[in-house]
Amino acid sequence: MNTVRVTFLLVFVLAVSLGQADKDENRMEMQEKTEQGKSYLDFAENLLLQKLEELEAKLLEEDSKESRNSRQKRCIGEGVPCDENDPRCCSGLVCLKPTLHGIWYKSYYCYKK
């Protein structure tokens, strides 16, 4: 019976001493991994920031370009007076001097091309 107790006590002491050493090693490993994780997080954050900036630049570029499908705003329709220097006629219309009718009003009107 004493042999069992001594064996048990010996195994217990070894487990506690080795467990304590493993605990210190684990703590050091966790600190190293945490430091590495921070550097990885910084790298990932910078990469994400670059991608977001590229995406923002693309979106702003697309907004600045005029789409073919976009509707013209504040354009002048056919037969409406326009300014010779700043014609705002709708697409398919040109600002021209009128022939016969309308010559007594303004000097230029929007007409079909």
Curated annotation (Swiss-Prot):
One of its GO terms (molecular function) is toxin activity. The keyword Signal applies. Expressed by the venom gland. It holds the Pfam family Toxin_22. Residues 61-82 are annotated as: Disordered. Disulfide bonds join C75-C90, C82-C95, C89-C110. Residues 1-21 form the signal peptide. InterPro entries: Toxin_22 (IPR012627). Probable ion channel inhibitor. This is U11-theraphotoxin-Hhn1a.
